[in-house]
A protein has these predicted regions:
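Structured beta-strand/loop patches that form or line metal/cofactor-binding pockets in enzymes
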Residues: 1-48, 53, 57, 71, ...
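N-terminal amphipathic alpha-helix/helix-capping segment at the start of soluble metabolic enzymes
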Residues: 2, 129, 133-144, 353
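Conserved, mostly hydrophobic/aromatic
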Residues: 3, 49, 68, 119, ...
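Metal- or metallocofactor-binding catalytic centers and their adjacent structured scaffolds
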Residues: 5, 45-130, 393-394
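Shared catalytic-loop signature of beta/alpha-barrel
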Residues: 23, 222, 228, 239-254, ...
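Hydrophobic faces of well-ordered beta-strands that scaffold small-molecule active sites
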Residues: 52-54, 147-153, 174-178, 201-207, ...
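Metal-dependent enolase-superfamily TIM-barrel catalytic cores that perform enediolate-based chemistry
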Residues: 137-251
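Extended hydrophobic packing segments that form well-structured cores
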Residues: 361-394
Length: 394
């Protein structure tokens, strides 16, 4: 089996109106979540008729996608490692998130091509089809057929957030993750959520490190004592593990770190710096760090970028494999974006998303929707292009 053609289509699918934040927080960095952050839908074709689908993280540079595609053309997908997918990488070619331009994250050296996620999914889709099994089987085998998910919201007024939480609960969701910052009305927001949904509704607060200091985090945490907050995620800079150790010692509210790299998970476990992890990365990378968390006795969830259907399906497959993934993942892009670009949406039952049955990824592109949201111009050329083994392309 040989990869004989790769087609890439750049798309922009906006968030639904008012899906992210209250009007008073519309100027918050990252509030639009899609402006200037296009995605790529990848179709990888083989010489025996299989087609694998992939989706990049928002904002992945065109150059990274093109270099990855060129490296895979002519390769046998049955002889590639999903765990160690070695694609050409220029450390200067990274997406805006990893430069700290979307959310406040520590800027660090990126060790792989940022398009790796998208191509890993497409290759896994091909392998699953070739072997007649769902992608989760390639990742180690599912331990569950559905994955717990929680709804998501950006920064909102207490009144708006209470209404959003109630709407989510009425749709079956058991919890909500919210974005926040140091000087927001935290108690009033949380009180509005619990007044609307009751004390069993789960609430995750994620300031993207914008509680700033240990002292401010302690102040906010003590203000919320007595309310059943599930977790503070990344309250302060996450490279300061000393701060997390102290906060865990002094706060009643559990703490989570949002991590990707195995060495960071090892360091956090060694310091006993977190109660929970929000893990990101490729499918195989998530399974790897999820196993590490399981050995350490730490529960995890899978973070997202409020993505489209292909990435969300990949998250469901990966989460189904990791026994420690028992917290609510935010696999809810199709509730918040105008379209998911797949023919049949993922199936949600209560606060769970069903793992697609496969074979492969188990989703099909909606070509009409793809055409509707296509972007004509990319970073350095047309928004849509393809290459093949004959040397032709467009």
């Amino acid at each position: 089996m040989i990869i004989d053609r790769i087609e890439v289509r750049r798309v922009h699918v906006p968030m639904k109106s008012d899906a992210v934040a209250s009007a008073s927080f519309s100027g918050d960095r990252g509030a639009s979540f899609t402006a200037g952050l296009d995605k790529h839908i990848i179709s990888v074709y083989t010489d025996d008729g299989l087609v694998g689908l992939g989706e990049t993280w928002k904002g992945t540079p065109d150059l990274a996608v093109r270099r990855a595609a060129q490296a895979l053309l002519g390769r046998d997908p049955l002889r590639l490692s999903l765990l160690r997918l070695d694609l050409p990488h220029d450390p200067a070619v990274i997406n805006p998130r990893d430069r700290g331009e979307v959310v406040a994250v520590p800027v660090r050296s990126i060790v792989q091509n940022p398009a790796t996620h998208g191509f890993e999914i497409a290759l896994a889709d091909i392998l699953g089809q070739a072997y007649g099994v769902p992608v989760c089987q390639l990742l180690g085998g599912a331990v569950r057929d559905r994955v717990l998910v929680h709804y998501w919201s950006g920064r909102r007024t207490p009144e708006d957030l209470g209404a959003i939480a109630k709407m989510a609960q009425e749709q079956g969701f058991a919890g909500l993750k919210i974005k926040c910052a140091r000087d927001d009305p935290h108690y009033e927001r949380a009180r509005a959520v619990y007044d609307a949904c009751g004390p069993d509704f789960r609430l995750t607060m994620d300031p993207n490190m914008r509680f700033d200091t240990i002292e401010d985090t302690l102040r906010i945490g003590r203000e919320l004592e007595g309310l059943p907050i599930e977790v503070f995620e990344d309250p302060v800079p996450k490279d300061d593990l000393d701060a997390y150790v102290r906060l865990r010692d002094e706060l009643e509210i559990p703490l989570a770190l949002h991590l990707e790299h195995p060495q960071d998970v090892l360091a956090a476990v060694a310091r006993d710096a977190a109660d929970m992890f929000n893990l990101r990365g490729t499918m195989s990378g998530f399974v790897q760090t999820g196993y590490m968390a399981e050995v350490a006795g730490i529960r995890v969830w899978r973070g997202s970028g409020l993505d489209l259907g292909i990435l969300d399906a990949s998250y469901a497959h990966a989460c189904s494999v990791v026994a420690s993934c028992t917290l609510g993942s935010d696999i809810v892009g199709n509730f918040l974006r105008e379209d998911d670009l797949i023919a049949e949406p993922l199936v949600y039952e209560g606060s769970y998303v069903k793992v697609p049955a496969g074979p492969g990824l188990g989703v099909v592109l909606d070509e009409d929707a793809l055409a509707k949201y296509a972007v004509d111009q990319g970073d350095d050329g047309p928004g849509s292009w393809s290459i093949d083994t004959t040397g032709s392309g467009k």
